[in-house]
From Swiss-Prot:
Positions of disulphide bridges: none
Modified residues (O-(pantetheine 4'-phosphoryl)serine): 35
Similarity field: Belongs to the DltC family.
Domain of life: Bacteria
PROSITE patterns: CARRIER
Name of one Pfam family that matches: PP-binding
Keywords of the record: Cell wall biogenesis/degradation, Cytoplasm, Phosphopantetheine, Phosphoprotein
One of the GO biological process terms: lipoteichoic acid biosynthetic process
Function noted in UniProt: Carrier protein involved in the D-alanylation of lipoteichoic acid (LTA). The loading of thioester-linked D-alanine onto DltC is catalyzed by D-alanine--D-alanyl carrier protein ligase DltA. The DltC-carried D-alanyl group is further transferred to cell membrane phosphatidylglycerol (PG) by forming an ester bond, probably catalyzed by DltD. D-alanylation of LTA plays an important role in modulating the properties of the cell wall in Gram-positive bacteria, influencing the net charge of the cell wall.
Location relative to the cell: Cytoplasm
Organism of this sequence: Streptococcus thermophilus (strain ATCC BAA-250 / LMG 18311)
Name the UniProt record assigns to this protein: D-alanyl carrier protein
Keyword Phosphoprotein set for record: yes
């Protein structure tokens, strides 16, 4: 499974929201993510992709859409 598909699956599993048709929509404004959800998402991303997401890199504006999450995970996997 590619990173995009897996990120979509993780968001769906955690928040019961299919974001495949809203990849560029702000997930905070859409009510998908909040502060607690962000923590859950980071933990799951780290577990599934064997990465470490530094808190300093998980800014709301930097990881607020599914596409930005995919991009961030891809960068961390390639680091």
């Amino acid at each position: 499974m590619d990173v995009k598909a897996e990120v979509i699956e993780i968001i769906d599993e955690l928040f019961m929201e299919d974001v495949s048709d809203m990849m560029d929509e702000d997930l905070f404004d859409a009510g998908v993510l909040d502060s607690m959800g962000t923590v859950e998402l980071i933990v799951e991303l780290e577990s599934r992709f064997d990465i470490r997401v530094p808190v300093s890199e998980f800014g709301r504006d930097d990881w607020n859409t599914a596409n930005k999450i995919v991009e961030g995970v891809t960068e961390l996997r390639n680091a």
